[in-house]
């Protein structure tokens, strides 16, 4: 496998988008241990918490997120605290794993397929309590490229922002669909800044990329790049091939310490209620959120904001409900079956634990 790391000095005038930042070195170390750790999460304001757990208080660590910002700025969070009697303490950090490991967070958000890496790094037993958004990366090529799938790109330059994260999911899918290995010789892997991948593609410095659409708005809008597989994300293809009707694998789920969950069922239920409200607000005020918080979608110009509104309306990766049932958990776990079967992860990597609460009251 040839891996090239590209460093660019090109300025990008917008912040990282909704849940697509690259994790810090701590998370990268966990990924190296398990070949399973990913990109990022979403979050909030406030200083990093050093407080200990206490009843009635939910310590939630997240990275910047438009739905949370909207709920905070419109008073929904304050009203929820008054109505429930619970309080939520938030910590703004890209090192969710670090706070979690130190015992300073009860709930964080990460990809479902990151959870084994989280447990390995933090040495804490966890449980997935809610779902948030699907893994949304796409395979993109230049608009004038004749390739119809990655099978047509053997030996060419594939840009990725990490060799873990969504690359793991695509590695399993490509092995299943084309009997090819993404990270073992079938492509020249170019590791580059996540925000510059689609620009590198448009300029001809790479031949394809595993890209996020919300970080590719300008190139998608001007028609210089196009997605393969009919524009389907990794989650779309996974569901189509392995779990019909499923909405994952998840780019972000809500993960909590199992000992905390076992002792705080009321807090867990109230937290999920708050996020169900957030998901409902997203469905009703999606365009407004994109306008109010364009930095979370990596857009800045009116043209790119308008494009992102239209794109998300057609390809919304946010789930309709935060709670899930046993069948959903089983379908979500099947990504690990596929990864093990295709040799992307080792056979000793265990599935994460899930807490199905759809229709269940505390």
Each predicted region: which residue ranges?
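Bacterial N-terminal signal peptides that target proteins for export
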Residues: 9-29
